[in-house]
Every structure is written in C-alpha cells, then in structure tokens.
Amino acid sequence: MTTYNLRLKAKSELTPHPTAQYWRKCQVEELFEMPFMELIFKAAQVHREHFDPQAIQLSTLLSIKTGGCPEECEYCPQSARYDTGLEKQVMMDVEEIVEKAKIAKARGASRFCMGAAWRGPKPKDIKVVSEIIGVVKALGLETCGTFGLLEDGMAEDLKQAGLDYYNHNLDTDPERYNKIVHTRNHDDRMDTLGKVRHAGLKVCCGGIVGMNETRPERAGLIASLANLDPQPESVPINQLIKVEGTPLENAEDLDWTEFVRTIAVARITMPKSYVRLSAGRTSMPEAMQTLCFMAGANSIFYGEKLLTTCNPEEDSDRLLMDKLDLYPLAYEPSDA
C-alpha cells in the first residue's frame, strides 16, 4: 500500500510558508490567553482581510449510511460498540439522496455533504457514491464526502466523479488522540488526508471541543490543523453533543467563552479557511453564535439534522441571519 503523508511544516523552516506560518503550540496557547475582547477584535480584523464579514456559507449534511460503524470513537453515537439506541441502517437509495439534495438547494444551501458510517469504504461503495456525487454535482451544488479511511486510488475516483471536498477531521490534540479514538491513530488520519491532497481534492478538516480536554490541548488541536500544508480550505469546529450511551455522555460542559475563543484562534491561525460553526449549535444562544460570527466563523451546517443529531431549523437560522444582516454565499466553481 502506498502511504501519502500530508506534509507538516517543519519547525526548522526559517522562512514562513507563502500562505501560512508554522504555529508552535505555545504560540497558539498565547492566543487563547489573550483578553477575550482583544482576541475577538484581532480575529475580526483577520477575517475582514480575507472575507466579506457579512457572507455565510451554508452546508447541508446528510447521513447516507447510518449506524453500525466498527470504529470506537468515544464521542460518536454511530459506533456499533456503544448502546445508544441507534439502529444500523443500509445505505439510502440514490433517488432519496438526490431528493434531499434538491431540497437543500431550494432552501439556500450551496454545499451538500454526505457522510457514511464506515471505517472506510469498499471499492463497491466508491462506485455507488461516485454515481451519487455526479448527480448532486449536476444540480449546481458543491459536493463534500466523509467516508472514512481511503485506500489507494479511491480519492482519485471521487475526484473524477466530481467531488469537491473530502472531510476527514483530526478530532483532537494529536497527543491525546488515542484517549478518544481506540481503533485508529493520528497517522491513519494523516495518511488519508495526504491521499486526498494528492488527488487534487479540497480538504475539510477540523475537530471537536468539549471532550474534557484542557486549553493547552485545544491549542494542540488548532496547531495541528493550522500546520497542515496546505491549510484546510474548510475547518469545522464542533462542540461535543453528549449522547447517552457514549463514553463522553457525562463530559464536563465547556464554558461558552472557551468555544468562542476556539473559533477566534482558528480564524487567526487559518486566515483563508472557511471556519464552520458546526455541531452543537442547538445549545448555543443567538448571542453566542453572533460572537462566533464576529470572531470569524463564516460557515454553518444548515438543516434540521447533523448525521444523527439535531440542528437548528432552517427558519431560525435565516431569521438570525436577517437580524445580523448576513447573507448566504452562493456557490461558484472558484469558491473554496
């Protein structure tokens, strides 16, 4: 098997990367330690240098194959190893997926993300999802897939089918990765990310906060994302949704200011990436989400469900956007 390692910028590099610097973990920690208002202000300045601060990219996420995943990730209700009451389902029919995509576009989404609860797809799965990708792409939607670990040639097949983005999160600080995920390691993630880049696909890569990590460990997650070379085009920042039956169901609540800080630090360290305010928004008051947008979040998951968990309804999101004078970003082939 060929191993593709997504290059991490080396500490020995004295000249910054043309588009991104190397971020030492201690430097990222210093950002987290800034006075809250100063941090938000700095992040807002960086955001305005690269984006229209009123524009929000809307993505709809659909689970096309739910439950029964053989992986053991302590945050995930889809693992077959946990009793969460979620039943394993077969893959959705192509026609049903396409209908969901049409609805998403009609409601204003510009990107359609499809997820499957696999450790990794089999060749026959790639054939099926490639057909789906082609049809969804023809609707005028940007396409994203999250299908797990990829074997050689699969990323190229997905690219050929018309996939724009591949989502593969780093989840948490590399130093604590195997405290959270027990059936794969950080290098496995990096290998698939390397294959995705090698195939010419754009990368969607983020993580989850609120899993009992410390602030330095949150800094480690952001540093690991910011030091991917090149940086991810999309960075979803998820707040843990605590699901009964998972090992993290009783995780300590993350203070809301710490989540906003994480958004701000992601914006500063990855100035040209779309920073997505991702899972956990149902528990976020409008004022908190507003601060996240001020701090540089410029993408949300849009639709009533995120894989298996609830998400704000479209009407409430549009109402909030109207209050804040935000507008949905239209899809153009040149967009990130």
Curated annotation (Swiss-Prot):
The keyword Iron applies. Binds 1 [4Fe-4S] cluster. The cluster is coordinated with 3 cysteines and an exchangeable S-adenosyl-L-methionine. Binds 1 [2Fe-2S] cluster. The cluster is coordinated with 3 cysteines and 1 arginine. The keyword tRNA-binding does not apply. SMART domains: BATS (SM00876), Elp3 (SM00729). Its EC number is 2.8.1.6. It catalyses: (4R,5S)-dethiobiotin + (sulfur carrier)-SH + 2 reduced [2Fe-2S]-[ferredoxin] + 2 S-adenosyl-L-methionine = (sulfur carrier)-H + biotin + 2 5'-deoxyadenosine + 2 L-methionine + 2 oxidized [2Fe-2S]-[ferredoxin]. Keywords: 2Fe-2S, 4Fe-4S, Biotin biosynthesis, Iron, Iron-sulfur, Metal-binding, S-adenosyl-L-methionine, Transferase. GO terms for biological process: biotin biosynthetic process. Its cofactor is [4Fe-4S] cluster; [2Fe-2S] cluster. Transmembrane segments: none annotated. Pathway: Cofactor biosynthesis; biotin biosynthesis; biotin from 7,8-diaminononanoate: step 2/2. Residues 54-281 form the Radical SAM core domain. InterPro entries: Aldolase_TIM, BATS_dom, Biotin_synth/BioAB, Biotin_synthase, Elp3/MiaA/NifB-like_rSAM, rSAM. GO terms for molecular function: 2 iron, 2 sulfur cluster binding; 4 iron, 4 sulfur cluster binding; biotin synthase activity; iron ion binding. [4Fe-4S] cluster binds at residues 69, 73, 76. Pfam families: BATS, Radical_SAM. It is an enzyme of class 2 (transferase). [2Fe-2S] cluster binds at residues 113, 144, 204, 276. Catalyzes the conversion of dethiobiotin (DTB) to biotin by the insertion of a sulfur atom into dethiobiotin via a radical-based mechanism. Belongs to the radical SAM superfamily. Biotin synthase family. Homodimer. HAMAP family: BioB (MF_01694). This is Biotin synthase. It comes from Actinobacillus pleuropneumoniae serotype 3 (strain JL03).
